[in-house]
């Protein structure tokens, strides 16, 4: 199975000094609002992604926890990473919405991760909808947010 250029770029850049940081900002740059959370990609491979953000003043709300929208940005980035790393090269994806459950106050360093099976994008027909699960944990390993991101999958147009 052939995967996209984003995964190849990650695999090359992670070996370089500051490569993960540079890759993180390059990936987020394509959806500039993601830059507001200053994400760092921990890992990206077919079936799995992990991305971290630190709590700071710019992403806090009035009760000094990480703002819900910042957490959703983290969720969206983790989903995008695992989708890019896992989807076959002849398909494309588009997020259509997310169902989010806030379980605890989101404070400190947060890590979003997503795991999907190898057969995840093997739909009976295209286009079709899949749900990508994303879990957000704090530095103590406690899940603070859980989300299912609805993703529309279709074949790339022929060139």
What are these regions (language model features)?
Residues 50, 97, 146-150:
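Well-ordered beta-strand positions in beta-sheet-rich domains
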Residues 81-117:
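Hydrophobic beta-strand-centered segment that forms part of the acyl-chain substrate-binding groove
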Residues 69, 73, 77, 97-102, ...:
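Hydrophobic alpha-helical segments of small multi-pass membrane proteins
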Residues 9, 54-79:
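Hot-dog-fold acyl-thioester-processing enzymes
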Residues 37, 47-49, 94-98, 108-110, ...:
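A generic structural signal for short beta-strands and their flanking turns/coil linkers
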Residues 36-44, 48-54, 60, 66, ...:
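Soluble, non-transmembrane catalytic domains of enzymes that act on hydrophobic metabolites at membranes
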Residues 1-18, 106-107, 117-159:
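HotDog/MaoC-like acyl-thioester-processing domains
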Residues 1-52:
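Non-catalytic linker/capping segments at the edges of enzyme domains
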């Amino acid at each position: 199975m052939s995967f996209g250029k984003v995964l190849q770029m990650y695999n090359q850049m992670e070996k370089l000094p500051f490569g993960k940081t540079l890759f993180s900002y390059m990936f987020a740059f394509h959806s500039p609002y993601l830059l507001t959370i200053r994400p760092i990609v921990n890992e990206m491979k077919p079936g799995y992604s992990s991305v971290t953000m630190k709590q700071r003043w710019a992403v806090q709300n009035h009760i000094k926890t990480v703002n819900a929208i910042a957490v959703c940005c983290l969720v969206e980035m983790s989903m995008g990473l695992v989708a890019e790393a896992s989807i076959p090269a002849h398909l494309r994806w588009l997020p259509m919405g997310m169902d989010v459950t806030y379980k605890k106050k989101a404070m400190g360093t947060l890590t979003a991760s997503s795991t999907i099976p190898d057969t995840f994008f093997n739909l009976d027909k295209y286009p079709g909808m899949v749900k990508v699960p994303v879990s957000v944990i704090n530095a103590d390993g406690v899940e603070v947010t859980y989300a299912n991101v609805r993703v529309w999958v279709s074949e790339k147009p022929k060139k």
